[in-house]
Amino acid sequence: MSKLGTLGARLHHGEVGYDFVKNRKIWYGISILITITAIVGLAVRGLHMGIEFQGGAVFTTPKNMSASVAQTETWAEEASGHDAIVQKLGDGSLRIQIAGTDTQQSDQIKEDLSKNLDVSAEKINADLVGPSWGDQIANKAWQGLGIFMVLVVIYLAIAFEWRMALAAFVALIHDITITVGIYALVGFEVTPGTVIGLLTILGYSLYDTVVVFDSLKEQTRDITKQTRWTYAEIANRSINSTLVRSINTTVVALLPVAGLLFIGGGVLGAGMLNDISLSLFVGLAAGAYSSIFIATPLVADLKEAEPQMKALKKRVLAKRAQGAAKGESAESAADEGAYDADEPDDAAPAVVGPRNQPASRGRGRGRPSGKRR
């Protein structure tokens, strides 16, 4: 068995473990700091919405264009007066996105691009997206996200309890905020692929959280009938028992996404992969973090505020104090007995061998001598 497998077995049986719940304030602080940074980035820089959401034009040139991406981007911005995004496709053609343009402007931009690129205007394909259609798509995307969140909370409240539903909801908001904030900070374009990535990472984060919650539900069944563990301690054991599984699942999911983001988008220059791969990469990492460090410790906080759990904690601590007192008294009695049994250092050595007794004067009187008379 591998070392990781051995560690997983020891974590599952409670032989080793890290106290996530005890140190929850540290993880809460880290999450709050990251979330504030994401919100500030979102407020200052804002999201770079794609033309699918704000409207605009997309121009596609013929294959095997010799013009560079940077030069084409400069020509497109000069022709339109707006920011342009240029991507070189696999067949050598150029894809030029310009937001905030209408039909009349797109015709003029198309003429200017044909002159700069030395290509006939008829060979440049132009697709227009109206701003009203983009707003409609954006509104439907947000509505779909909101409906998803509501359904998740209802399901968790029915399958588990409302405290777990609330903790899972907080974890999902945590993951969305961090992912959207990272998008704002790096300046990547928000496209329908980004929305797909967000929905995907929400499902993954929810799955990872439900795995821990299911283990917690099983281990806390009839918890008030015992006086060995508190709810927080059982919650911590649930995290540790599923820790290796969560790590393995996260690593396996992150590897192909990292390949899309860093190799496909970064090294090979396939920029269209960035919109979905970045949301998946950040969201998967944030989801794994929130399911371990946020959701379950938050459930422990909410549960231990209940009167039953408070009474259980008092009984557990009282029993431990009583056991510790008995252990100390037994240990002190054993030490005292051992001290009394020890001889002092200056004691004379014990006499070993036959004991010399004084001779009796009347020894042999009245007894037959054994001689014949």
From Swiss-Prot:
GO terms for cellular component: plasma membrane. Pfam families: Sec_GG, SecD_SecF_C. It is a multi-pass membrane protein. Signal peptide: none annotated. Residues 362-373 have a biased composition (Basic residues). Residues 322-332 have a biased composition (Low complexity). The keyword 4Fe-4S does not apply. One of its GO terms (biological process) is intracellular protein transmembrane transport. This is Protein translocase subunit SecF. It comes from Streptomyces coelicolor (strain ATCC BAA-471 / A3(2) / M145).
